[in-house]
C-alpha cells in the first residue's frame, strides 16, 4: 500500500512538472512570435510605403501623358520663362529657412508644372530611388516625397540652371533618400517633367554644413540638378549633396524599378528567420521530448500495475 501511494505521488509530481514546462514553453513561444512581428512589421510597412510612392510617381507620368501636347508645351514654356526671372539664388537651406507661402511670388511658383499637385518625378535607378517631386520643402511635401527647393530653377533644364531637390533620410517606414549615400560618380539621375525626360550624370558628391550654399548656386553655361539630404544618420549636422550634370539620355539607362532594400531590412528579416527556425527546431525537439515522457510514464504505469498484481498475489498466498 505504501509503495502504491508513493508511486502515485511521484507520478502526480511528474505530471505537474510537465505541465509547468509546457506553460513555460507556451509563454516563450508567444514572446518569440511577438519578436518576429516586431522585426517584420517595419520591413513590411516600409516596403508598402515605398511601393505607394512608386505608384504615385507612375500615376503622375500617366497623367502627364494624357495631357494634350499643346498643354505640355505650354507648361514647359512658362517654366522656362519663370527660370529666366529667377534671381541668382533663393533659400540657402530647406531645413532652416522657409519662404512666405502666402506671397504672390510663391503662389505663382505653385502654379508652375503642377499636375495633380505633383511637379515632376525623379529616378536614380542605381539605388532604387523613384519618387514624386512636390513644390517646396514643407513638412507635408517632405513627408510624401521629394521637395523642390523654392528659389532654385524649375526642372526644365537649360544652360545656367541649377535645380535642387531635397528629401529626408531615416524615416521610420519610408526609404526616401536613405540610399543616396550609395550613389557614385557616373550614376544617372532622370527627371520626368511635363512629358520630357532629362538625364543627368553624377559628377560631384560632397558633404557640407547647412550654411555652405555655394555648391548649389547656378553656373554659367552649366545645367545641373542636385539631390540633398541630411547626414550623418541620426545627427543631421551636415548636408549630403549629389550633383548631376545634364547629358543626352543614353540608351543604356536602367528604367526598371526595384523597391529599395536596405541593410537594416536584411538584418531584421534575417533575425526573424533565425527565430522562426529556432521555433521549428524547438517544436520538433519538444515533440520528441513529450513522446519520451509519455513512453516513460506508460512504463511507470505498467510497472505500477505489475507491482499491484504481484502484491495481490502475495496477499492471496
Model feature map: region roles:
Residues 259-272, 282, 295-305, 309-311, ...:
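Alpha-helical transmembrane anchor segments
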Residues 16-264, 289-304:
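Solvent-exposed, non-transmembrane regions of membrane-associated and secreted proteins
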Residues 1-20, 297-317:
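Acidic/Ser-Thr/Pro-Gly-rich, low-complexity N-terminal segments
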Residues 33-36, 270-277:
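Core hydrophobic alpha-helical membrane-spanning segments
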Residues 273-287:
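Alpha-helical transmembrane segments
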